[in-house]
């Protein structure tokens, strides 16, 4: 069962249900991408043996033009969006379903399984600012934002 709620704004009933194992979501779909820190939520999700499904994994298209991601992409023969998607799927218990408006974009989104980001790439990405939210749903932002 998927979920679209975060641990910061969850109702007591939802958290109690998970604690009692009456209801266990399989995934929590939230905004997650290279420019948004979700470490607290990821830790909670992993502790509950769930998955995080990254919503807006390309930051509403902003990552396609990110110079650092373009540079890493050139190193691997990929584009910036492929680097961003690869970064997500290299993480434990993280999945993503990126939007693609054309057949070519869908093809590119699937062409991320033939390379891996190395430690240098991951360290470079880790140094980026991680406070940029692009999905603005009033009342849905977690309490820790």
Model-found features: residue ranges?
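Beta/alpha (TIM)-barrel catalytic core signal, keyed to glycine-rich beta->alpha loops juxtaposed to Asp/Glu
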Residues: 1-145
């Amino acid at each position: 069962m998927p979920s679209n709620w975060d641990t910061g704004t969850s109702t007591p009933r939802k958290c109690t249900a998970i604690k009692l194992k009456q209801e266990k979501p399989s995934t929590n779909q939230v905004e997650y991408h290279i420019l948004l820190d979700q470490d607290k939520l990821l830790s909670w999700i992993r502790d509950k043996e769930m998955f995080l499904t990254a919503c807006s994994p390309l930051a509403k298209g902003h990552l396609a033009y990110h110079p650092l991601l373009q540079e890493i992409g050139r190193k691997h023969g990929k584009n910036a969006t492929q680097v961003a998607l690869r970064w997500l799927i290299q993480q434990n218990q993280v999945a993503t379903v990126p939007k693609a408006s054309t057949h070519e974009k869908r093809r590119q989104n699937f062409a991320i399984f033939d390379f891996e980001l190395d430690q240098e790439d991951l360290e470079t990405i880790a140094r980026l600012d991680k406070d940029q939210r692009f999905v603005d749903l009033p009342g849905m932002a977690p309490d820790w934002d």
